[in-house]
């Protein structure tokens, strides 16, 4: 699901990044921590979101200001009640194998996605679509249950509502795999070798503006230090990613070197811990509140993140739509944390440094992706901070798939988590809280008002009334904040390190995409 996404790009932008080496004016070599996967446009891990977006395209394209522009659809209209939408498709688009992209092909893709509707239930649009049909070669009609306000934005997402040539379905479906990743986008996956590389070439028959680059090779390089060394020795010309891009002390050093060009974007998403409200001892509000006061976030960011990110006080940054609510932050205050625990009956026995209640120690597991050195470093700092208030935090480092399984089934006390950035936040991120697709559903299971929160999420996605929408978002986000379900840590920015001759490197409006088509290598 999106988690894969997030941890895929966001452990793939977060757990790595990408590296680019200008082998020639029209060829670059990049690096990624894992292979890009089979590139099924309608499924999740191990498919890498940035690569899905290179090959497959949406009806409408998301922009940095939150709007959408025509893409495979050149125009659209909707009924007065907002439930029936008619899209007029471009008539000059073909899949990279020469098959025509038309309304029939688009409708078949929607059918394939919705035949696997339960898999996509985290995204409300998958639940809202009632019917999709081709009215003609160029007219596509989509009927919804209600006037769903994020409809166009969710059509623009990297997955699942993008289009593969119907000839590449397996047994008329995509839920069990595809034959080959044939899309309409500017890139074609030419070759993959497991644990070694993936090669993309420019789609020479692309209907839109062709990229300047003809070939991109993604070498599989999991280690950030190896990437940094490659850049420093001149083998790599560009690195682009999030906080896992390269060792952050190295980024800080590169930033001081006039021979290198470095960039930090505006904050794009939040890294936090999800606290399990249904599992002792984090089922107690006082414990969750105390843990929020226990972590010295500024020190953590200065030491583990080398000051490259911003302290997070709330689930979403105030810059996120509907999230600038003035919620009171739980700023670092270990004495207040201790007082909360004392009042809740968690006392410190003589001669011990771990609190107990009814003979049980205040012991909490913190789960993280074991191969992510940055998460490990952050976990160790959090562990030390929480020990200062008498909490014994045991660290559970496991492979990525195991951590996501823990998120889905609730086998965690605390677990690293993050929001998804534009265009998912806040609406799609909140929508997913209603199903066990990510850590949020399980983390909230112990809340008495969980049914109300879920009900209000459904209402906020369907209402026409902007005043009601604002009020619902305020209530949902305030409840989650007051219940201390999350321990926000930092607001994450995208990072770029490049040779100055590449100029200013653009950021994609969708955080999980990489704008390779806008990169124009320049000869020295």
UniProtKB/Swiss-Prot annotation:
One of its GO terms (molecular function) is transition metal ion binding. Belongs to the bacterial solute-binding protein 5 family. The lineage of its organism: Bacteria, Pseudomonadati, Pseudomonadota, Gammaproteobacteria, Enterobacterales. The gene is nikA. Residues 1-22 form the signal peptide. GO terms for biological process: negative chemotaxis; nickel cation import across plasma membrane; nickel cation transport; peptide transport. SUPFAM superfamilies: Periplasmic binding protein-like II (SSF53850). Disulfide bonds: none annotated. Keywords: Nickel, Periplasm, Signal, Transport. It is found in: Periplasm. It comes from the Bacteria. Involved in a nickel transport system, probably represents the nickel binder. GO terms for cellular component: ATP-binding cassette (ABC) transporter complex, substrate-binding subunit-containing; membrane; outer membrane-bounded periplasmic space; periplasmic space. Pfam families: SBP_bac_5. Gene3D superfamilies: Dipeptide-binding Protein, Domain 3, Periplasmic binding protein-like II. This is Nickel-binding periplasmic protein.
């Amino acid at each position: 699901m999106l988690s894969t996404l997030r941890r895929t790009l966001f452990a793939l932008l977060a757990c790595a990044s990408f590296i680019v080496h200008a082998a020639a004016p029209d060829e670059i070599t990049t690096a990624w921590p894992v292979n890009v996967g089979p590139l099924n446009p309608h499924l999740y891990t191990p498919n890498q979101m940035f690569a899905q977006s290179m090959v497959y395209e949406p009806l409408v394209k998301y922009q940095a200001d939150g709007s959408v522009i025509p893409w495979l659809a050149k125009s659209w209209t909707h009924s007065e009640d907002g439930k029936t939408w008619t899209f007029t498709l471009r008539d000059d688009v073909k899949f990279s194998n020469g098959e025509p992209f038309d309304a029939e092909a688009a409708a078949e893709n929607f059918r394939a996605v919705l035949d696997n509707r339960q898999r996509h239930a985290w995204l409300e649009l998958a639940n809202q679509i009632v019917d999709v049909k081709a009215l003609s070669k160029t007219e596509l009609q989509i009927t919804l249950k209600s006037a769903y306000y994020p409809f166009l934005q969710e059509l623009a997402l990297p997955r699942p509502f993008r289009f593969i040539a119907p000839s590449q379905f397996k047994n008329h479906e995509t839920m069990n795999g595809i034959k080959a990743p044939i899309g309409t986008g500017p890139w074609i996956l030419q070759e993959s070798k497991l644990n070694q590389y993936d090669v993309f070439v420019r789609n020479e028959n692309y209907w839109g503006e062709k990229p300047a680059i003809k070939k991109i090779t993604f070498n599989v390089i999991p280690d950030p230090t190896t990437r940094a060394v490659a850049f420093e020795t001149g083998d790599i010309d560009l690195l682009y990613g999030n906080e896992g891009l390269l060792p952050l002390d190295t980024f800080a050093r590169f930033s001081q070197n006039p021979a290198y060009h470095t960039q930090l974007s505006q904050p794009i998403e939040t890294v936090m811990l999800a606290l399990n409200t249904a599992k002792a001892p984090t089922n107690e509000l006082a414990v969750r509140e105390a843990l929020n006061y226990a972590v010295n976030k500024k020190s953590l960011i200065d030491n583990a993140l080398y000051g490259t990110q911003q302290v997070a006080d709330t689930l979403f940054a105030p810059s996120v739509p509907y999230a600038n609510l003035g919620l009171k932050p739980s700023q670092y205050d270990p004495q207040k944390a201790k007082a909360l625990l004392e009042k809740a009956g968690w006392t410190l026995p003589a001669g011990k440094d771990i609190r107990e209640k009814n003979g049980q120690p205040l012991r909490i597991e913190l789960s993280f992706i074991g191969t992510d050195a940055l998460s490990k470093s952050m976990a160790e700092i959090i562990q030390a901070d929480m020990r200062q208030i008498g909490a014994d935090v045991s660290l559970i480092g496991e492979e990525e798939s195991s951590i996501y399984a823990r998120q889905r089934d609730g086998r965690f006390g605390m677990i690293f988590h993050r929001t998804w950035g534009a265009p998912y936040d806040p609406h799609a991120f909140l929508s997913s809280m209603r199903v066990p697709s990510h850590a949020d559903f399980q983390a909230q299971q112990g809340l008495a008002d969980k049914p109300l929160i879920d009900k209000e999420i459904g209402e906020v996605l369907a209402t026409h009334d902007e005043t009601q929408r604002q009020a619902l978002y305020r209530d949902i986000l305030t409840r989650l904040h007051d219940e201390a379900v999350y321990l926000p840590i930092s607001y994450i920015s995208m990072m770029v390190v490049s040779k100055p001759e590449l100029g200013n490197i653009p950021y994609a409006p969708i955080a999980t995409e990489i704008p390779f088509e806008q990169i124009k290598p320049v000869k020295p």
